[in-house]
């Protein structure tokens, strides 16, 4: 279940940035400006290039501007992404392993960053095209592992996210039970490495 999760990290920027179609980009920015924080449940379905369902799952999603993100897949296999504002933690309980990336490193590798990363430089890396209540976000870089993201809104709420990868797989995430974050939810964006878990530290400062 980790592949769509890693693709989500690689999509962190597509949902937080864009450009080219100036009016469409501005409209998406306006939508996202109203989503400074939220918590929701999600269901996901992944289909391959032949439209065959290859994965399904459910979990909890939360975000807070700036640069905080929480994605907890609970069914059928648990996995977790936590962006604490500085680092991104990707935890696989089954493998007892956690990978750590610099936040900006993860953003540069991806597209859902538009949700939590609002700087102009990030938006300049993407093109945005609006179609009704949906926005198609495409990276300008040809080597991006996520080739496109589509986000759809309903009544000012983020309702659906769709990610397409280089292999043609489509991941669809439907959000439900959305609500603003409470004070107690601040702990969602804090990750403590469990005892006995291997750490794959990919942060640039760790590699120096």
Swiss-Prot record:
Task of the protein: Participates in the translocation of lipoproteins from the inner membrane to the outer membrane. Only forms a complex with a lipoprotein if the residue after the N-terminal Cys is not an aspartate (The Asp acts as a targeting signal to indicate that the lipoprotein should stay in the inner membrane).
Assembly, per entry: Monomer.
Alphabetized PANTHER family for the sequence: OUTER-MEMBRANE LIPOPROTEIN CARRIER PROTEIN (PTHR35869:SF1)
Domain of life: Bacteria
Signal sequence bounds: 1-22
Organism ancestry: Bacteria, Pseudomonadati, Pseudomonadota, Gammaproteobacteria, Alteromonadales
GO BP annotations listed: lipoprotein localization to outer membrane; lipoprotein transport
Family classification: Belongs to the LolA family.
Protein name, per record: Outer-membrane lipoprotein carrier protein
GO cellular component: outer membrane-bounded periplasmic space
């Amino acid at each position: 279940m980790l592949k769509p999760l890693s693709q989500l990290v690689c999509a962190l920027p597509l949902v937080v940035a864009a450009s080219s179609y100036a009016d469409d980009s501005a409209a998406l920015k306006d939508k996202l400006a109203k989503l400074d924080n939220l918590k929701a449940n999600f269901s996901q379905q992944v289909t391959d290039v032949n439209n065959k369902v290859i994965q399904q799952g459910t979990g909890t999603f939360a975000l807070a501007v700036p640069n905080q993100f929480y994605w907890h897949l609970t069914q059928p296999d648990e996995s977790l992404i936590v962006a604490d504002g500085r680092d991104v933690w990707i935890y696989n309980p089954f493998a007892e392993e956690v990978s750590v990336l610099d936040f900006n490193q993860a953003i540069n590798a991806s597209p859902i960053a538009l949700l939590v990363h609002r700087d102009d430089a990030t938006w300049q890396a993407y093109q945005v095209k609006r179609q009704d209540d949906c926005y198609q976000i495409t990276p300008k870089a040809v080597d991006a592992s996520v080739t496109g993201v589509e986000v759809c809104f309903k009544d000012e709420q983020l309702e659906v996210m769709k990610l397409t990868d280089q292999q043609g797989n489509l991941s669809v995430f439907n959000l439900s039970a959305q609500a603003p974050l409470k004070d107690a939810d601040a702990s969602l964006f804090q990750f403590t490495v469990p005892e006995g878990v291997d750490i794959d530290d990919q942060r640039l400062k760790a590699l120096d």
